[in-house]
Amino acid sequence: MNRPLQFVLLFFSCSLMQAQNVSPWKRVVAARNLASTRWNENGDPKKGLFFELDKSMVNSTLNSLQGANKTNEVVIEIPNTNGDLEKYEIHEFSNFDSDLQAQFPTIRAYIGKSLSDKSATLYCSFSPKGIQTMVLRSDKPTEFIEKISVNQEVYELFDSNSVKSDRLPLYCATIDKVMNSSLNKMTTTATSNGEQYKTLRLAVACTAEYTAYFGGTFQALEAINATLTRVNGIFNRDLSLHLNLISNSTSLLYTNPEADPFSPAITGVNGNWNLELQRDLTAKIGNANYDIGHLFGASGGGGNAGCIGCVCQDPISSYDVAKGGGFSSPADGKPEGDTFDIDFVAHEIGHQLGANHTFSHEIEGTGVNVEPGSGSTIMGYAGVTDFNIQSHSDDYFAYVSIDQIRTNLASKTCPLNTTIPNTKHKANAGEDFVIPKSTPFVLKGSSSNPNGAGLSYCWEQNDTATTSFGANSIAFPTKVDGPLFRSFPSTNSPNRFLPEQSKVVANSLTSPWESLTDIARTLHFTLTVRNNGLNGLAQTDTDDTTITVDASTGPFEITSQNTSDLSWKSLSIQTITWSVNNTDQLPGSAYVNIKLSVDGGLSFPIFLKTNTLNDGKELIVVPNGISGKNCRILIEPTANIFYAINKEAFAIGYTTESSCTTYPFATPIIIPETAEYSTKTITVLANSDAVLDVNVDLNFTHRYVSDVQIELVNPQGKTVKLFENGCGDTNGSLVLKYDDLGGAIICGKQTAQTVAPFEPLYQFNELNPSGTWTLRVRDAIAGDTGIINSAAITICSKSFTPIPLSPIDLTDVMIYPNPTQGDFVVLFSSQLDSGVTIIVHDLLGKKIVEKAFSSAPLFNEVIHLDALQAGVYFITVVDGSKTTVKKIIKY
């Protein structure tokens, strides 16, 4: 992970203010009076640009969206994480009932669409406290703007990759259960959220501790509005749903700990709050006056929905918890920000709406344990288990959660339904395929787009775990059930490579969260397409595909070009070989295409051969005029979805030389029990090489291993997490060699083991190694101690020397190789357009082979003589009116 990406709100303007030259933002010195900020209290001071905000100027702009003379929208500019100002057309996005909004006109929320990125949607809350924003976009992390000073208008822009991993995660006490039988029997043949936008009446209560944290009733309502802006942003995009805070909400915002109806947090989060909230809402609000109720606490570290899918359901007695029994309360005493809003509030309300847990580290028998380990979507348990994909949830619902919530709400009568006027898009997951074992593949989807929306695409495996839990919940090649592939946030591409193509390039076909299978399995995948629409217009659509893994075929893999320091010359003849392993018998796999990448496997735009037999061998001519230091080969069937990439990068037009050097860090290193990292560094002398591979040796001891976080930072500031809160309550030592090709950690093993890091080390590849490398370690939770006994980093790099170009006369026909074992290439420059004919005769003049080809400026075709006996043959090449005869020897 990169160090926090820190930009400052440089400018915020509106079309109504273009005549003014004064910006509402003023540059201030970073260190000025920031000691009182909550951020600094967290022990993580900011670095970067800081600005003070003229709230009155911004307020006058946004006020144009309200009042008797209100406009439908205005255009504002805010910075994105590239540091560029991005324009958004914004509209009102109130989280309040109309009466409550009239009562608090200065607490507002807005929604906006980017004018330059159709997938980007802005959600913005504004009040006397200041502005807070969230931008959801595909292919990039979510972006936030937050106030970071209590007494000053100082703001920062960051993204979700910058969220601090020491924020304590959610512990959800909601007991998962299958929805009631009437809902189970409902069919879900519809694959979208339909054409109805739903609105629910939300009652939010808060403890006196929550109100005191923000400074009073009004300030608590500001904070609730900020949280709901983020939560409603997710619900709008994924569920076509909006929660409106009821008009008499202030009666539920308690200020006196002695008078509020809730137990202290230490007992409340253990279950007392569910019934206490339900009773309070029944008494103060009345069951007929809200659809869903939730309590915000300020400490205790827990969440509990009370029941699953019981939105709209009234309690049947004073001891019954129904629609008004959910609560969220953080462990770190900070009931605000992305962790609280998404990991806590969106998760627990997701339960109330009808979604079960999606993790598979435990199997709850609900049919939706479809994420490996902890899971990473909203209804997972990111950062909580011994098998964490990541520290916190990504801000979207998995397909199974969307489906559960949609099915549940379809059975309810309390939502206010509004017809979505736009024609919905239609997802297409493509055909079903049969693929070989242990072979990468790519899912290819598409979607109609009748409204020209900024569509985003999310492929997810949809196989629930039935027996694979605990240590077996991770992905591994012989896993018999459950997920092999984690969920990733939506992208602009309708295709997904499995595993990630960067992992395939790094030869990492098996990792804890993405693994190919070595056994026969039937895998189910769902494509969810989001239109990222504004309030009342957002829709999703899904489609499924089935991938059958045939264990009698495969693996399909390239066996050539797999040695270090390999280089090619332009126009040279090269042999490419691959293991067929019966894959030619699979549907659509009798023929293959062979492609070339010159950018390390990011793309394969160059076809070396098309529609050639899947027979395991092909001679090719290296294209003229192409050079590259990081080239790879890809072979794919012409009508199937599996593929192979050769295992080593090679050069075209360069000779290469690789070397490896090990650099030890000074040890021992005391692991600090603070939010601050302890660091040690090594220095790599200046050179022009590129990183080929990085491995790390690490030996550390700790009384509670899961408290430990260890990272490696390269000279460019790129951060890779090596160890991140793993191995639970293990007490002792771990001796680890981190290699991307390593396996999962065996937590109780105290002898050396080669393991894959928490994040892949290949992220350092191709970067220059020169400069300072930093090892960072900390224990953010007090109570246990530890030490790094030894640590070293091995950096392998590669140098390149250009190959002098030698002129080649292609006016004459060249035949390579000669002698040959059977296959040879005919190469020449054809200036005609009348076709090329190649004829093979034996010594007696008998015609053996005759083939016709289309002309090409650089003609190169492979002729197969495998079936012929050893001997001398004559090759006749007819290019229009020109005829050339060559002799070739087969041995």
For the regions a language model picked out, list residue spans one by one.
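Exoplasmic/lumenal beta-rich domain surfaces
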Residues: 244, 456-519, 593, 598-618, ...
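The catalytic-center signature of Zn2+-dependent metalloproteases
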Residues: 246-272, 317-395, 460, 465-470
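Loop and turn regions of beta-sandwich accessory domains that flank beta-strands and are enriched
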Residues: 613, 624-629, 640-806, 819
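Fold-level signature of zinc-dependent metallopeptidase catalytic domains
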Residues: 21-24, 29, 33-36, 156-309
